[in-house]
Amino acid sequence: MKKIMVIGAGGIGSFLIPLLDRVNEYEINVWDDDIVEKKNLSYQDFYEDDVGKHKTDVMSYRYRNVKSHPYRVLTKKQLMGYDLVICCVDNLELRRLLYLVDTEKIKWLDLR
């Protein structure tokens, strides 16, 4: 099974994760330190019962191939060991980090 890192389980990530899970060929590691809030319900794939829970925990509960990492990605070391890193956040600091990595070692996509 290929290992994929999805950074961000919000507006983009919450809809991408079920699509990746459906393929059933990936171990999907979701990284996001955010908690579901009521304001997220209108544009993210979460429900009233999810409010107050970590977004990554909700995704790992719903989908069999998802592992929860309710943390912020801060270092290049955290990006290592994955076949593909998919960035689904609009955090400029994190995106700068991605643009500085050795693309021979880390393959990544920026979906923002």
Model-derived segments and their meaning:
Residues 1-112:
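Adenine nucleotide-associated cytosolic modules
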